[in-house]
């Protein structure tokens, strides 16, 4: 008996005549109305039974099924709320993508810190689960992008004090949740005898609880999770992760009903994809030229009913499972593969296109980290599938079809992102193919396949798909074993966001201190105040002083701390840093002002004013960037400073000079308009409802009420920093430069106020210095510099030409050169004390004459070699260089036709060249 068995013995099950049974196939316990049922109903224990025989009497579209669900729960006392974005890192910092509706309410609502937007509530939340990517297309039921229809209730135990959590008491719990599920099925005309409720305890994120999988006609249509436990080393319940758990004060109904699967159930199509993407599937089939006879179509449908057996989470070998399906269908497995694999690719393309539409529509920009990396991975896999199956429709068109269906307004930006990424991918493949060839040569002739970890690194670092590696490896005699869950393994490397490090141990005195009253929010321009010293912590260097109230701003949100002084009587101490810990502000000082002393504080006013101007200017630059570049632009990081500041934004290409000028123009127009900058502290749910999650450009603040900064009517953000009162106080904003931080993230460096004037003067000084050096007017510097550059390039080309002529002359003249016969081929051994370009040119000249070239140089006090080999000659240049370089204390290598290397021992150069003929002969014989 499991520890949680009692949790599943519901009054509702007893009242409705359910029986608890154990599946003889998988061992799962389940509840059913059917006394004769033996199996749990879930694949692979049972197959899909609704294909060509829908589970509901009426066929629903996606929108119709969504409305039926939400309306049902509205009629049963739930409030409908709008869905959140698929990029969960816009309101939380511990995950990247929204994978379930409960993500919308973690961690603040689920922990009881803030109330839910409604209680109970219902929602249909778009989600993306990267771990399902390898199942998409194969199982007939998996989609990477999906909508999780859900209803939630947030409860606390009655004995808990009312003010301890943001909600109190019980709304409803397990019996009502199962009854709602049953009644929903009944309202849609389902055969209730065919529904099974499988016990499957849930564990995740340090929480746990009983959970029920709801199976109907072979398909899992819902999961009912009852989150009521937390990890506890002294807990009474051991869960499937091996940890023990105990019950919490809060308990939450967390349900998930897959919209796509419910729609599929109502239509009874061969796979979920025909139900979800009917137009896209038809378009892709026609474009790819996929047509089936009536007999082939019947075989495909028969195979579809068994496709649930291909789930990589349940089988060790997908192809072996496909072979078993072929045996059951009495068809050759190769014939089955010919029919279904093109369809599996079609299904995956449709699903991935929808996933990309969600990602780019919600503002994710492709990059090498975080959500941007995941988007890039999906796009590149989709592009590979499109090319393999021979679809000639542009990928941006396929994604746009889904973006239009989803109602996104930024479709032009979405298409441009896709086109830009395709161009980058082509360049990546050109560079990466050479890497794969070298790797394949390394493993060719060995008994070892190219390891999975190497495949993952090739994909991560070079974007090279595993099937491309397999193709190149096969050509060169190497083998590759691509795991069935390859893309899920890639996603696992990037799925988790970086969490905060564990908090340091706290002094008991510190834990007893009250939160510091922050005066700077009441008057951001004020720099003087009075306070009482509550405590002083002595450090190895300096002191941390805690006051009852402060005007000093602590470092946070990319804004440096204020500095200044504290004065107690005749004693004045310098405040050199300010930090905040759990609401307590710590003033780092160079001396002890005395615990219990009354102090006067003086903030450095010039520093504060410059930081205020730069912080508000950061908001202006961000707003201007969205105006100029598009609404997909979001903050990726920021740092305010005294002389300049920077704003990192997510954008898919380099910012042009014209765009920089337009960003400056928009920002300075707001400065000239002198609009008010005001703050407010609204309820979090109300703020999110009114302004959306673009509020959180600089991170997600804690608390039920959050501070919003409004810049006129143009921009609103959650922000804890100090700001000017009106934009006119900034004076001016000047963009100093832009640069790529990483792929998909652009940095805008700018200055505001007096710092902008100083930066402009520094630029002008540099221009005037250049004008004096060139002896021209400052306005003529660009033209003069360009002329000088062209002349310099011309002379460089002349020098290169002369070097080539000299190399040819040396090659033909035989200066310091020895010719030897190596297996019927002439090899030239030559010493030439020139630079690397001269060595390469001379070697190339010999190779052009059909000769093996070994050219050495002792210039600059070291030895270097270049080896060139003509086509068709069985000598490996890389091995020759490696042997020779070792004789001068170094190393080197390269491809078989051209290699270079060297070492520090120039005195050994001649001996190495003398040995070159023997080296060539030994390697040729080997």
From Swiss-Prot:
EC numbers, comma separated: 6.1.1.7
Residues where Zn(2+) binds: 615, 619, 719, 723
Xref: InterPro entries: aa-tRNA-synth_II/BPL/LPL, Ala-tRNA-lgiase_IIc, Ala-tRNA-ligase_IIc_anticod-bd, Ala-tRNA-synth_IIc_core, Ala-tRNA-synth_IIc_N, Ala-tRNA_lgiase_arc, Ala-tRNA_ligase, DHHA1_dom
Chief localisation class: cytoplasm
Pfam families, alphabetized: DHHA1 (PF02272), tRNA-synt_2c (PF01411), tRNA_SAD (PF07973)
Keywords noted in UniProt: Aminoacyl-tRNA synthetase, ATP-binding, Cytoplasm, Ligase, Metal-binding, Nucleotide-binding, Protein biosynthesis, RNA-binding, tRNA-binding, Zinc
A GO-annotated cellular component: cytoplasm
Catalysed transformations (reactions): tRNA(Ala) + L-alanine + ATP = L-alanyl-tRNA(Ala) + AMP + diphosphate
Subcellular location: Cytoplasm
Composition bias, Gly residues: 888-904
Required co-factors: Zn(2+)
Region (Disordered): 887-910
Enzyme class at the top of the EC tree: ligase
Cell membrane found in the keyword field: no
SMART domains assigned to the protein according to its UniProt record, in alphabetical order: tRNA_SAD
S-S bonds: none
Example GO BP: alanyl-tRNA aminoacylation
Cofactor note: Binds 1 zinc ion per subunit.
An annotated Gene Ontology molecular function: alanine-tRNA ligase activity
Keyword set includes Endoplasmic reticulum: no
Gene3D superfamilies linked to this entry: 2.40.30.130, 3.10.310.40, 3.30.54.20, 6.10.250.550, Bira Bifunctional Protein, Domain 2, Threonyl-trna Synthetase, Chain A, domain 2
Family per similarity comment: Belongs to the class-II aminoacyl-tRNA synthetase family.
Domain notes: Consists of three domains; the N-terminal catalytic domain, the editing domain and the C-terminal C-Ala domain. The editing domain removes incorrectly charged amino acids, while the C-Ala domain, along with tRNA(Ala), serves as a bridge to cooperatively bring together the editing and aminoacylation centers thus stimulating deacylation of misacylated tRNAs.
Functional description taken from the UniProt entry: Catalyzes the attachment of alanine to tRNA(Ala) in a two-step reaction: alanine is first activated by ATP to form Ala-AMP and then transferred to the acceptor end of tRNA(Ala). Also edits incorrectly charged Ser-tRNA(Ala) and Gly-tRNA(Ala) via its editing domain.
Protein name: Alanine--tRNA ligase
Provenance organism: Halorubrum lacusprofundi (strain ATCC 49239 / DSM 5036 / JCM 8891 / ACAM 34)
Gene: alaS
